[in-house]
Amino acid sequence: MQPESSQREETPSLLWGLDPVFLAFAKLYIGDILDLKESRQVPGVFFYNGHPIKQVEILGTVIGRREKDAFYSYGVDDGTGVINCICWKKSNNAAPSSAAPALGVLNLTSQLKKLQETIEQKTKIEIGDIVQIRGYVHTYREEREIRVTTYYKVDDPVCNIQIARMLELPSIYRKVYDQPFCSPALEQERAFSDPSALDLASLTRLLSERAKEFLAENKVQTFYQQELEIVESLLSLANQPVIHGAGPEQGDSKSDTTSKAIHSIFKNAIQLLQEKGFVFQKDDGFDKLYYVTREDKELHRKIHHIIQEDCQKPNHAEKGCHFQHILACARLSVSPDLSEGVLQQVLELLEDQSDIISTTEHYYTAF
């Protein structure tokens, strides 16, 4: 549920577009949608833990149904709450043509009619049906509701889709919605205007982002932490939280403390890059050498070879290889410590290069 930090001051509306949640259909529990606080700046925009939200996606059971002249109203329950969903009826203004259609047109019309029947079957909702709904959050007469843009009935006889949703949402909440929005660009601007405004965690994130930019711009393949610590632009940023005024008699002590603090903040910044898969270590990091994921051509070649070989097997020929299968094979043949983040970075790069494609979510096949 929504943490207490959601009560803090709203982010200025000009900065909402920097938060990717703002433009996405947020997968929230209905109970949290009912508790969202509406923006004081722009009506129709709501906040969850500082994230601006205007559109959501829900999955639940229909427990109520009302029909009006212009719309259907469905009560949807996901176990955390019940929300009203407004589905507008489509107006059928197409006038029938009096001219006799040609054979090709007749065949096309027949196909379109079948498609329309399928759509009507999927969108004919009754009480007890499982539905997936996307739409805009709205408040009408002080009651929270969803103005639906797309919806369909979910065929889920053995509850696979519902179980997958139950497993997916806690992870999304933990990684996205419950994390306060932090923009590296904004933190960088704040650091230059007022260095004291950043706490150590914010400065570490900013240093991590700047280090990533440095590695990408210079196409660095491998590096030691000490090599980053002597980069002037990074060092000046890392110095900010540990610069203190000191008398002559305390100079050596402060210098030692500052040196340790700088080493620590660089270590934590690199650890953030490791967690996201931008860099990694081999052989348990025994030699303390870091490899840049996007520059390790040998790793790319091995991952591509795994997908290429396994996609020729009958059980992977149709859908391709699942992410977890690729990860398991890579840990056997490449490195037992290969992280999901590193593999995700490699897969995205291979997909950008058109070496592989994503057939469905989390499934990949190679050419």
UniProtKB/Swiss-Prot annotation:
One of its GO terms (molecular function) is single-stranded telomeric DNA binding. Keywords: Chromosome, DNA-binding, Nucleus, Telomere. It comes from the Eukaryota. Residues 190-294, 295-367 are annotated as: Winged helix-turn-helix (wHTH) 1. Residues 56-154 bind DNA. One of its GO terms (cellular component) is chromosome, telomeric region. Coiled coil: none annotated. It is found in: Nucleus; Chromosome, Telomere. Pfam families: STN1_2, tRNA_anti-codon. The keyword Methyltransferase does not apply. One of its GO terms (biological process) is telomere maintenance. Component of the CST complex, a complex that binds to single-stranded DNA and is required to protect telomeres from DNA degradation. The CST complex binds single-stranded DNA with high affinity in a sequence-independent manner, while isolated subunits bind DNA with low affinity by themselves. In addition to telomere protection, the CST complex has probably a more general role in DNA metabolism at non-telomeric sites. Component of the CST complex, composed of TEN1, CTC1 and STN1. Interacts with TEN1 and CTC1; the interaction is direct. Interacts with ACD/TPP1. Belongs to the STN1 family. This is CST complex subunit STN1. It comes from Ailuropoda melanoleuca.
